[in-house]
Every structure is written in structure tokens, then in C-alpha cells.
């Protein structure tokens, strides 16, 4: 025995940290499947403010990271604004970097994955 714990004891210690995120994944996976949400269909969890604010900000964030726009002065928002405050209020998360791996047209589906990942992290 290394460190005084056998494999079963290590599993028992880790289970409270592993079970809640997996439970969220299973519950959300079932809900997404049942309602035809991406990745099981074409639906999205995006509604109201997420469609009007968060998704456009994620597309702007992708443009900033790919060099098509600037973080300090962005003319695609409100006729020209500094995006720093908005970044920290809305989209400051390591998960936001996942926008770099999808097309701008698919960001509306990415928010489904981001929602589940954030809920799993919170669990």
C-alpha cells in the first residue's frame, strides 16, 4: 500500500468529487436528448439574453482572438466600445476559449456544451 490507502479507499475518497458532475452530465444529457437539443438534435438552450448578448459577445471574442477585431475599441458593439468590462462581466471563463475551435455559425450550439460544462464544474 502506497500512502496508506488502497484503491478502494481512494475511490471512496474521490467519489464525492466525481459523482455530482457525472450526475449533472447524465441528467442534462437525458434532457438534451428528450428535447432534441444539440448534440442530439438542432435545438439550443439559448434564449433571450443569451441569444441577444452572450452569443454576439462570444463571436466578438472569437474575432478578437483571431486578430479580426480589437479588445480596447470594438466598432461591432454599441457603435464602438471598450470590450474589457463586458468581457469580465459576461464571458470571462476558461471555457470561453472553446470558441476558438468552432465556426462562428456554430457558437449557438457551443453554448449548450458550455452550459453543461459550467453546471458540471459548479456541481
PLM regions and their residue ranges:
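Membrane-interface coil-to-helix junctions
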Residues: 27-122
